[in-house]
């Protein structure tokens, strides 16, 4: 089962050729996903190198957040959020980022970037999550507009009203706008389960039964994720 989930996730998120980075919709931050995995024996070195790269990015002007984690198969996925494409380009040209990126790429057996558009980025101002929870959802194109309304309502309500829900972040693939990548940050497992059992998710889940045609849940290892404190909207 684990192998099947890994293959599905890799096929959907990594199996794409590197896509050109395009600007997100107007008034939305610029986002992209970066994915890394190491050859056997290089795992710890790559973890350290990716951490250094993400720190360099977060210290760059115009970078709002870099959130992510490592799954049970050693694949690291990070959502990079910038104020706009200009900030993205400036960060990539930074000497600190270029040096850190070169080291990470040297150690990575696989490195992919996925062009994405920010759909909805809901976040509290402060907090630390136990890990990043991720999901990939494929939506029936004929029901895409209806799905977006249901998802946006659930995200906004949960982050505003549920104490342990720190951030719910949704992006869509630029090349396939009916494919959603979700990154969710909860204070702990109790907060996550309270959200799943709560009214907002239950209403959402009931409404989308015929809208979601495929779903992959990505299980990440425990890894503290601290909110950047920056406005993501």
Segments predicted by a language model, with ranges:
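Surface-exposed interaction/gating patches
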Residues: 127-168
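Positively charged n-region of N-terminal signal peptides that target proteins for export
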Residues: 1-4
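An amphipathic, aromatic/His-enriched active-site/gating alpha helix that lines ligand/cofactor pockets
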Residues: 52-65, 81-114, 159-166, 185-220
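A structural feature that tracks compact, well-ordered secondary-structure segments
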Residues: 35-36, 53, 66-69, 79, ...
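Short, surface-exposed ligand-recognition loops at beta-strand->loop->(often short) alpha-helix junctions
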Residues: 35-48, 138-147
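Glycine-rich beta-strand-turn "strand-cap" elements at beta-sheet edges
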Residues: 23-31, 64-76, 99-136, 166-178, ...
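Acidic/polar helix N-cap motif
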Residues: 42, 84, 140-143, 176, ...
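Bacterial N-terminal signal peptides
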Residues: 7-17
């Amino acid at each position: 089962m684990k192998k099947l989930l890994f293959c599905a996730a890799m096929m959907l998120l990594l199996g794409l050729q590197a896509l050109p980075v395009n600007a997100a919709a107007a008034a939305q931050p610029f986002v992209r996903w970066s994915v890394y995995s190491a050859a056997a024996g290089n795992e710890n070195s790559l973890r350290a190198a990716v951490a250094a790269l993400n720190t360099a990015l977060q210290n760059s002007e115009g970078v709002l957040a870099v959130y992510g984690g490592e799954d049970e198969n050693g694949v690291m996925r990070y959502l990079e959020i910038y104020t706009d494409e200009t900030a993205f380009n400036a960060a990539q040209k930074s000497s600190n980022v270029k040096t850190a990126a070169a080291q990470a790429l040297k150690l990575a057996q696989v490195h992919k970037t996925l062009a994405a558009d920010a759909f909805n980025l809901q976040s509290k101002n402060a907090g630390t999550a136990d890990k990043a929870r991720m999901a990939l959802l494929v939506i029936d194109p004929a029901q895409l507009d209806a799905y977006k309304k249901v998802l946006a309502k659930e995200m906004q309500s949960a982050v505003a009203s549920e104490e342990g829900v720190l951030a719910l972040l949704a992006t869509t693939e630029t090349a396939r706008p009916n494919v959603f990548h979700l990154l969710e940050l909860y204070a702990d497992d109790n907060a996550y389960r309270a959200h799943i059992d709560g009214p907002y998710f239950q209403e959402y889940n009931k409404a989308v039964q015929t809208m979601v045609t495929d779903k992959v849940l990505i299980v990440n290892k425990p890894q503290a994720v601290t909110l950047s404190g920056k406005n993501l909207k």
